[in-house]
């Protein structure tokens, strides 16, 4: 197995410009493909997950012109021209879920599959919602999981659709993005959310991007979403993808742990991503942090001890960036508790179990619950821990921060960061100093 040895480092400073957001990149690609007109997308993320989406769109007949981080998409006016396709989508949830929904109403014969882990990630609640529209979707192997076979159905949105909100917000995102493509005799298409909706900021991203493409969605609290009929996706002409706020979290934490000043460009107060809320968590932990509209700068910790303060936090709104808090908790002056993170279990790996296992390798005492984790930092970090990454980009990036504790750390399978940030380690090493 490939590995990368990092550190020991004691400082981190400099400036980094973030790659584009994965969540925004794949949403914008699909919306541009479904729109009327040509869309120029800039600062598009180049990663495994976006390549999977681009390849799928090309197979579906979408015309794309790529040049570096710019992509020009010629829209299909709401209907893909390819009526049959076999789509391998890797482990990209941001491609599998929305494409499943869009293809379910497209009137063709499609197969959607991915890596073995993708076939363990639930999709049943989305399929149930799409079947309420008349979609014909079959499971090829296990009920509730990919691979999927999609066939033409009698599609309409006359009756409200109900979808669970407590497993993944991507199910609701996928339905909302698809409803403008579906005819309705009632004048509106309605989605009812059953139970507590998790990861609400990701729904905010979806609604704001749909609006950029000409679709207004009426939100009634977090339990009902109404799409008035007669709307069609229209290209905004051009759209820039803001920096990835989840990826920002590693560098912001590095600025706190390594003294800074470390400036992250590409996200800030004007961001539409919920994970920018990680900055508030860092401030609660004692970091010296300043923020502009599209930048954030961290200058170490405001305590004489140089240690972060432990926190007890509900992480429902920042599930991905919360992983960074878990590793930063190794540098806190007491036990940190992260709550409401059940969604970790259905991500690229079971992140709760993986996080607990790897934190223990560097000396932490960890209590892992169904939807929480408690991290008690060690007196001294254990050097030369070999961190397993579970083919999960965020596990690899999070644990790079251990090297800022003055100990070397080994990251196994470092290339898994290709999912969202292929040159992450080069960028991290450029900012870290012994």
UniProtKB/Swiss-Prot annotation:
Q: Where in the cell is it found?
A: Cytoplasm
- Reactions mediated catalytically: 3-phosphoshikimate + phosphoenolpyruvate = 5-O-(1-carboxyvinyl)-3-phosphoshikimate + phosphate
Q: What UniProt keywords are attached to this protein's entry?
A: Amino-acid biosynthesis, Aromatic amino acid biosynthesis, Cytoplasm, Transferase
**InterPro entries, per the entry:** Enolpyruvate_Tfrase_dom, Enolpyruvate_Tfrase_sf, EPSP_synthase, EPSP_synthase_CS, RNA3'P_cycl/enolpyr_Trfase_a/b
Q: Which residues bind 3-phosphoshikimate?
A: 22-23, 27, 168-170, 199, 320, 347
Q: What is the similarity comment for this entry? A: Belongs to the EPSP synthase family.
Q: What is the protein's name according to its record?
A: 3-phosphoshikimate 1-carboxyvinyltransferase
What species was this sequence derived from? Paraburkholderia xenovorans (strain LB400)
Gene for this protein?
Answer: aroA
């Amino acid at each position: 197995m490939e590995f990368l040895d990092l550190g020991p480092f004691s400082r981190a400073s400099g400036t980094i410009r973030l790659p584009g957001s994965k969540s925004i990149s794949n949403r914008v690609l699909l919306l541009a493909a479904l729109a009327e007109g040509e869309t120029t997308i800039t600062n598009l993320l180049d990663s495994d997950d976006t390549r999977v989406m681009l390849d799928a769109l090309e197979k579906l007949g979408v015309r794309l012109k790529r040049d570096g981080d710019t992509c020009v998409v010629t829209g299909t006016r709401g209907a893909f021209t390819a009526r049959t396709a076999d789509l391998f989508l890797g482990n990209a949830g941001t491609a599998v879920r929305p494409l499943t929904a869009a293809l379910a109403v497209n009137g063709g014969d499609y197969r959607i599959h991915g890596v073995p882990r993708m076939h363990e990630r639930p999709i049943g609640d989305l399929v149930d919602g799409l079947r309420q529209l008349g979609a014909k979707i079959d499971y090829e192997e296990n009920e509730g999981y990919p691979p999927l076979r999609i066939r033409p159905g009698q599609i309409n949105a006359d009756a409200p659709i109900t979808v669970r909100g407590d497993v993944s917000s991507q199910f609701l995102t996928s339905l909302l993005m698809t409803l403008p493509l579906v005819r309705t005799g009632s004048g509106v298409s309605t989605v009812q959310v059953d139970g507590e909706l998790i990861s609400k900021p990701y729904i905010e991203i979806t609604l704001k991007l749909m609006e950029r493409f000409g679709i207004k969605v009426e939100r009634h609290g977090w339990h009902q979403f109404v799409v008035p009929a007669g709307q069609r996706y229209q290209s905004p002409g051009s759209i820039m993808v803001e920096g990835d706020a989840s990826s920002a979290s590693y560098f912001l934490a590095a600025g706190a742990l390594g003294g800074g000043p470390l400036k992250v460009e590409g996200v800030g107060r004007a961001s539409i991503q919920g994970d920018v809320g990680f900055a508030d968590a860092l401030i609660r932990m004692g970091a010296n942090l300043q923020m502009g509209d599209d930048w954030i700068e961290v200058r170490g910790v405001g305590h004489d001890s140089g240690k972060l303060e432990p926190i007890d936090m509900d992480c429902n709104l920042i599930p991905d960036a919360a992983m960074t808090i878990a590793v930063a908790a190794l540098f806190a002056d007491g036990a940190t508790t992260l709550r409401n993170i059940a969604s970790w279990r259905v991500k690229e790996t079971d992140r709760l179990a993986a996080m607990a296992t790897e934190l223990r390798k560097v000396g932490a005492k960890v209590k892992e619950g169904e939807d929480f984790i408690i991290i008690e930092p060690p007196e001294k970090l254990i050097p030369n821990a070999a961190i397993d990454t579970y083919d999960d980009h965020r596990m690899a990036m999070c644990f790079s921060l251990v090297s800022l504790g003055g100990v070397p750390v080994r990251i196994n399978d470092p290339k898994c960061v290709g999912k969202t940030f292929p040159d992450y380690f080069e960028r991290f090493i450029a900012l870290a100093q012994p």
